[in-house]
Structure formats: C-alpha cells, structure tokens
Design a protein with these regions (language model features):
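Conserved C-terminal portion of the radical SAM core fold
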Residues: 1-50, 94-110
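Radical SAM enzyme core and accessory elements
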Residues: 50-56, 61-145
Length: 145
C-alpha cells in the first residue's frame, strides 16, 4: 500500500470577493471526500501579468506600482469595499475549522477569526480540538516508509 497525503487548498480574497462567496468555497470544500488530509486557504496574491491583477488595478484595489512579494502571503494587498484585510486574515486563519467542524460550531469559529484576546483564546481551544479530532497525519512523518 502507498502512503500519501492529499490537500485541498483554496484561494480567497480575489477582486470583489465577499464573505458570502468565501463561504460558498467553504461549503464546496465541506463536500469533498473525507479522505482529504488537510484543507486550507491562501490569500490571493495579485502577481504581475495576471488578468486578476489588471482587474484589481482597474478597480483601484491596488496601485500599478505595488509589487506582490512571495514572502508576504498572510494578508491581502487589495483594498476592497467588499471585505476588509482583517476579515480576510481571520477567515484564512480559521478556514480549516469551518470546513471540518459541524455548522453548529460556526459561532465559536467566528469568534476565533478575531485577533484579540477572545479570538486568540478561542483559536487555541478550537485548534487543539481540531488537531485531536481531524488530523490524520503526524507532522514531520515520512510518507515514504
């Protein structure tokens, strides 16, 4: 038998994306097979030469002279009226929780989106529960053994 890990990564924070559209993505990921080992979200990066960067410039969400860095993917470069940078960072942080926990737990996860004491405390609690319940691979394990 072969050992492998499968991941379902998403990109959030594209031009004009809203919280509701991000939850469409979350609900799509929730329907994927149970044997997906990990889910996550990365925040959209407006790389030069891409049509979405051109759209973001046209809409005034980014200036043409702004350069997208590979080293800073934890926050959005876009300044959009549809969703704030802080909300995007919070959603990216808890994306995996939304995809795995039952919907009845979503009010707790919403608290964990925040970067204040209450949010950090809730994230620590839910993160431990997530690891204990949903992690199927051991970090650093050699998948080739």
């Amino acid at each position: 038998e072969h050992k492998y890990a499968s991941c379902a990564n998403s990109i959030i924070g594209m031009p004009d994306e809203t919280r509701d559209l991000i939850f469409d993505t979350i609900n799509f990921v929730r329907k994927l097979p149970d044997n997906i080992d990990a889910t996550g979200a990365f925040i959209f990066a407006p790389y030069h030469g891409t049509p979405l960067r051109d759209l973001a410039i046209k809409k005034g969400y980014i200036k043409d002279e702004e350069i997208c860095s590979l080293s800073n993917t934890s926050e959005s470069m876009l300044r959009m009226p549809t969703i704030s940078k802080d909300e995007l960072m919070g959603l990216a942080k808890v994306f995996s929780l939304y995809t795995k926990f039952p919907k009845e737990r979503w009010p707790e996860i919403k608290i964990a989106e925040q970067s204040d004491d209450a949010g950090n405390s809730m994230m620590a609690k839910l993160g431990k529960e997530f690891d204990d319940t949903y992690r199927t691979t051991v970090s650093g394990a050699d998948l080739h053994d």
